[in-house]
Amino acid sequence: VNDPFITTDYMTYMFKYDTVHGQWKHHEVKVKDSKTLLFGEKEVAVFGCRNPEEIPWAAAGAEYVVESTGVFTDKDKAAAHIKGGAKKVIISAPSKDAPMFVCGVNEKEYKSDIDIVSNASCTTNCPAPLAKVINDRFGIVEGLMTTVHAMTATQKTVDGPSSKDWRGGRAASFNIIPSSTGAAKAVGKVLPELNGKLTGMAFRVPTVDVSVVDLTVRLAKPATYEQIKAAIKEESEGNLKGILGYVDEDLVSTDFQGDSRSSIFDAKAGIALNDNFVKLVSWYDNEWGYSTRVVDLIRHMHSTK
């Protein structure tokens, strides 16, 4: 672990106690010394370097590094971890030039000679599997996506300056805040056949975790809502099990807290205007689900060695 801003005892505290996900109830987590954490009996080295090139990943035996600062998101900057001895870098955010992979959608296109990848965003991971099913079965002519997104750390607790996004500077816990998102367009990067066919926006809302996507699309091949539901249910129990979920109960956002799936289709929430125009609703735990996909992508990358 590398973090130049916090100490090992504070790392332990933050890991053990989480406002959203509760207390850590599994193996003991404690501090061995200022440069080592203990997860059960396993030692984890801790560094405090500001420059990724200076982190001794090789000495620690770290082959796969998750770049989750939000700062080093392009290939050149993320490559600094390679200079520090890492073999592969997984960027936990969209990247303008690193190849983007979404588990269940295009991860099989990964080749072992690719050293720096992006796991896309939590929001892209939600509509992408859903859009893949719909496009494969019925074809998507065009579509609009809206994510109703829980608060994140980039927002303000009270009104504050935000010169690039004036609305984004308003108090997160007291407002519904319209915002931009590249998540829908990014679906076109992992599903090239949808490139240019999807775009979208976001509403930031005063909840702390779990978000929901509204994907409204025009279909190439007519289909009833029942046929669409059946196709999604079939894939959720087959090829996309563990990635795409299906629920037909009257659930709300907190019911999906801690759900490790990327996208949980809500059969009762969607509607169809006609057999060519449909609104699909899918939930995601933007923290837990996305973190699980990062691990899944690393596992897949390792399996290609």
Curated annotation (Swiss-Prot):
It is an enzyme of class 1 (oxidoreductase). SUPFAM superfamilies: Glyceraldehyde-3-phosphate dehydrogenase-like, C-terminal domain (SSF55347), NAD(P)-binding Rossmann-fold domains (SSF51735). Its EC number is 1.2.1.12. It is found in: Cytoplasm. Its main location: cytoplasm. Gene3D superfamilies: Dihydrodipicolinate Reductase, domain 2, NAD(P)-binding Rossmann-like Domain. The active site is at C122 (nucleophile). Transmembrane segments: none annotated. The record marks H149 as: Activates thiol group during catalysis. NAD(+) binds at D3, R50, N286. Pathway: Carbohydrate degradation; glycolysis; pyruvate from D-glyceraldehyde 3-phosphate: step 1/5. InterPro entries: GlycerAld/Erythrose_P_DH, GlycerAld_3-P_DH_cat, GlycerAld_3-P_DH_NAD(P)-bd, Glyceraldehyde-3-P_DH_1, NAD(P)-bd_dom_sf. It comes from the Eukaryota. Key enzyme in glycolysis that catalyzes the first step of the pathway by converting D-glyceraldehyde 3-phosphate (G3P) into 3-phospho-D-glyceroyl phosphate. Essential for the maintenance of cellular ATP levels and carbohydrate metabolism. Belongs to the glyceraldehyde-3-phosphate dehydrogenase family. This is Glyceraldehyde-3-phosphate dehydrogenase 2, cytosolic. It comes from Hordeum vulgare.
